[in-house]
């Protein structure tokens, strides 16, 4: 069954301008632990553009029936990592998104990769943020085991890393409490309304975005079988339809006979052997990703199984299940339990482009390196 959300090829003048904006890396330059700053307009514009791109399925990003004019953006929540037993600021900024009652409903993450601005929208960590009083100052700290939400009084574990991954970080217990107090946070208050110009100007009759409602399948906590969760989600969607939960990640791992990390070729080839109706093509690298992924989603009603590389090293599989022709894509991440889907940014030109997305759990950027798709 095909359940896809599409929108006609329409785009506003302001949206085109927003997408075309470039952001200087200096826009992110702040002194360590500085939090009381204005939201830079180019950053605001990029986040606004990312929100506009997910409007056709906003319910998956915590926005539900909210009108975008009701939303506001808060000061960024600073993030840190523990490296060599020291607290070090991360070039990764989380902007909470608030509804009209000043409740956190979603969150934007933003960073730069090779001079390109990367924005992701997700509901990851939102449930924990909603439990924090507005006057509490919060920050996010990544150690060797996972991310933590820090306030003046509490430390909440947000997620766990995959097996055998520590992202080169030390354990938070190695840092004394006085140093952790330097991770100055911000209060959870909406400070800048989101006021995009939603007037649109038709450019044609073709569709400009496609989203497949693939089932959410999680990998077991602490495991490295993200690939199995992606196969389960894809097979469930193709064989049984949206929302189906016939196969789990562990079911697929048992069928493959592996409970360890695998390469993309083995994942795709074995899936084809086990499920004769799949017959996916494994791309040996990352070439021609833009037209191939677009075609697989829009023409073949087939999610793409993508192998991404962390900026800190190591790989992770996610299902590419949506794409907007003007620079965003959407994934099902089996590692993040707090979100159904997450958006990423497409940069570059031509047939081979950069598909980059921020890992809220890993505090790192993921970039597509291999993929399996329906030809």
Residue ranges and their predicted role:
Residues 33-105, 113-125, 249-375:
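Conserved active-site-adjacent core of cysteine acyl-enzyme catalytic domains
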Residues 117-142:
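Primarily single-stranded nucleic-acid-binding OB-fold modules
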Residues 132-134, 153-261, 312, 343-344:
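Active-site-adjacent structural segments surrounding the nucleophilic cysteine of cysteine proteases
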Residues 91-99, 139-141, 146-151:
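Short beta-strand elements that form the blades of beta-propeller/WD-repeat-like
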Residues 21-35:
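Sec-dependent signal peptide cleavage junction
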Residues 3-14:
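Bacterial N-terminal signal peptides that target proteins for export
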Residues 13-22:
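Bacterial N-terminal signal peptides
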């Amino acid at each position: 069954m095909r359940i896809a959300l599409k929108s006609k090829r329409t785009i506003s003048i302001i949206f085109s301008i927003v997408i075309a904006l470039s952001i200087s890396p200096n826009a992110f330059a702040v002194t360590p632990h500085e939090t009381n700053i204005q939201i830079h307009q180019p950053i605001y514009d990029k986040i606004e553009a990312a929100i506009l791109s997910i409007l056709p399925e906003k319910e998956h990003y915590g926005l539900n029936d909210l009108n975008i004019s009701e939303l506001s953006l808060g000061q960024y929540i600073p993030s840190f990592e523990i490296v060599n037993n020291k607290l070090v600021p991360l070039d990764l900024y989380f902007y909470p998104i608030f509804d009209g009652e000043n409740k956190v409903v979603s969150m934007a993450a933003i960073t730069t990769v090779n001079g390109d601005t990367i924005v992701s929208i997700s509901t990851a960590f939102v449930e924990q943020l909603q439990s924090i009083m507005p006057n509490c100052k919060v920050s996010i700290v990544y150690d060797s085991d996972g991310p933590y939400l820090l306030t003046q009084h509490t430390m909440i574990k947000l997620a766990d890393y995959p097996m055998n991954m520590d992202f080169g970080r030390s354990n938070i217990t190695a840092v004394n409490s006085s140093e952790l107090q330097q991770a100055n946070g911000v209060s959870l208050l909406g400070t800048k309304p989101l006021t995009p110009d939603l007037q649109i100007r038709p450019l044609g009759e073709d569709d400009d975005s496609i989203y497949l409602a693939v089932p959410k399948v999680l990998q077991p906590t602490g495991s490295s079988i993200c690939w199995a969760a992606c196969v389960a989600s894809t097979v469930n969607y193709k064989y049984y339809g949206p929302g189906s939960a016939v196969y789990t990640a562990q079911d697929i791992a048992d069928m493959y006979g592996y409970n360890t990390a695998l390469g993309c070729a083995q994942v795709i080839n074995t899936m084809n052997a086990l499920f004769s109706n799949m017959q996916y093509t494994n791309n040996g690298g990352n070439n021609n990703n833009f037209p191939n992924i677009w075609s697989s989603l829009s023409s073949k009603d087939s999610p793409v199984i993508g192998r991404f590389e962390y900026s800190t090293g190591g790989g992770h599989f996610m299902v590419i299940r949506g794409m907007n022709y003007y620079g965003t894509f959407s994934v099902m991440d089996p590692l993040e339990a707090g979100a159904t889907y997450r958006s990423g940014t497409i940069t570059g030109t031509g047939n081979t482009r950069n598909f980059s997305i921020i890992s809220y759990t890993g505090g790192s950027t993921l970039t597509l390196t291999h993929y399996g798709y329906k030809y």
